[in-house]
Amino acid sequence: MRLERTFDPNDLSTQNMESPICLPIGFVHFLAQSQTLQQVLDTVAEWINRIFESDRTSITLYENSDYLKVYSFSGNKAIPADFLVPIDQAFVGRVFKNQQLIICDDVSQSDELDCVMLTSSGMGTCMDAPLMHGQMCLGTLNVAHHQTHFYTKEQAAQLQCIANWIALNIALHIQIMKMEHLATTDDLTGIPNRREFMRQIEHRLSEFRTQGIKFHVAILDLDNFKKLNDKFGHDAGD
């Protein structure tokens, strides 16, 4: 009996170009209302769990060359949020590296770390799709069910379609976060710049006036800072 089925994301798309996909209005609504990347991921995890009638849905994103990180999950708590999944020792790691959607029809037959954890929490099968943005894989979108051999090729095509759509949303939020970091961080010191300092001061003052929340400001006098200004300009370190 088969243990795994592997699908190329492009093949799943090209072979199902005319196939419809139906999404709950609530899913699209709350996704559009999401203000942060974490809200996007939490919304996706919750609604994908419903759409695929899964016992667990999770999302991992690239953390570094060795690990993927579980950023959100819904349902079964086999693998907790913030868990670092070793790429070279996990099923999701293979999905990420190979950029292939893979269905493990019986996780109890796998010795990979995440499959072992799923098995220990009563899961029977899992289906993981790469979050593809162009030629780059951002992470994985994963569903699991307590029954073995539960997911179909049709569901694989649907999950990959949603994963491609969500990957674009994730990429946009990551780009916004990078732009916000550049706009609020001093290049020389790597700490918040004057613009961000003033924004925080205004926010804290507003909280103090409206809610009585106290705050403190510490001032440091740095010796020889004029030399830095003379060398790098007055905008540096501001």
Where do the model's predicted regions map?
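Signal-transducing coupling segments at domain and membrane junctions
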Residues: 69, 78-80, 105-125, 145
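Signal-transmission linkers at sensory-effector interfaces
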Residues: 1-39, 50, 179
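Short beta-strand-to-loop transition segments that serve as allosteric relay/switch motifs
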Residues: 76, 139-150
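Conserved nucleotide-binding and Mg2+-coordinating catalytic segments in signaling enzymes
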Residues: 29, 180-199, 220-233
